[in-house]
């Protein structure tokens, strides 16, 4: 699995011009599932993301978690996180998980986040989405299961 995590002041996702997910201060998470990913891997990523101390305290030090700041989550599926650009000029996506499997992992990840975070918004798996955000920092983190 790959996660691109961005600290945001606000973010939203639109499908066909309609806002389907909207958050204030919190995290925008781009979620990608790879061929070898399994549901058993999810708890450690949910725990890591929810506990990461990447929000600033009163001294400007990144010392607070999402829960500490009452932050919100916007989770958007993005298979292109598995783009392989090593050969030629057109990315290959053969390392991305099959749509049915990836969607099941995405939905389970969202459900697990909803157990821990009061406000979790999402895009729609497989849809053409327009994501808007205002980065806070910017502060962006990449988590890759191959490195975890």
Swiss-Prot record:
GO biological process, one term: D-amino acid catabolic process
Main localisation: cytoplasm
Any single Gene Ontology cellular-component annotation: cytoplasm
Substrates-to-products reaction catalysed: glycyl-tRNA(Ala) + H2O = tRNA(Ala) + glycine + H(+); a D-aminoacyl-tRNA + H2O = a tRNA + a D-alpha-amino acid + H(+)
Any Pfam family: Tyr_Deacylase
GO MF annotation terms: D-tyrosyl-tRNA(Tyr) deacylase activity; Gly-tRNA(Ala) deacylase activity; Ser(Gly)-tRNA(Ala) hydrolase activity; tRNA binding
Subcellular location: Cytoplasm
UniProtKB keywords: Cytoplasm, Hydrolase, RNA-binding, tRNA-binding
Keyword NADP tagged: no
Listed EC numbers: 3.1.1.96
Short motif (Gly-cisPro motif, important for rejection of L-amino acids): ranges: 137-138
Gene3D superfamilies linked: D-tyrosyl-tRNA(Tyr) deacylase
Function: An aminoacyl-tRNA editing enzyme that deacylates mischarged D-aminoacyl-tRNAs. Also deacylates mischarged glycyl-tRNA(Ala), protecting cells against glycine mischarging by AlaRS. Acts via tRNA-based rather than protein-based catalysis; rejects L-amino acids rather than detecting D-amino acids in the active site. By recycling D-aminoacyl-tRNA to D-amino acids and free tRNA molecules, this enzyme counteracts the toxicity associated with the formation of D-aminoacyl-tRNA entities in vivo and helps enforce protein L-homochirality.
Protein family membership: Belongs to the DTD family.
Domain notes: A Gly-cisPro motif from one monomer fits into the active site of the other monomer to allow specific chiral rejection of L-amino acids.
Subunit structure: Homodimer.
Record protein name field: D-aminoacyl-tRNA deacylase
Annotated gene: dtd
């Amino acid at each position: 699995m790959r996660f691109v995590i961005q600290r945001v002041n606000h973010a939203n996702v639109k499908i066909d011009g309609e806002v389907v997910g909207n958050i204030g201060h919190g995290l925008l998470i781009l979620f990608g599932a790879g061929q070898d990913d399994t549901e058993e891997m999810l708890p450690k990523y949910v725990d890591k993301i929810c506990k990461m101390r990447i929000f600033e305290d009163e001294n400007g030090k990144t010392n607070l978690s999402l829960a500490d700041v009452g932050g919100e989550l916007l989770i958007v599926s993005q298979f292109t996180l598995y783009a392989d650009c090593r050969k030629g000029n057109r990315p290959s996506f053969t390392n991305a998980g099959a749509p049915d499997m990836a969607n099941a992992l995405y939905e389970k990840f969202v459900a697990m986040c909803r157990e821990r975070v009061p406000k979790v918004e999402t895009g729609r798996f497989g849809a053409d989405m327009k994501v808007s955000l205002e980065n806070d920092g910017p502060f962006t983190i990449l988590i890759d299961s191959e490195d975890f």
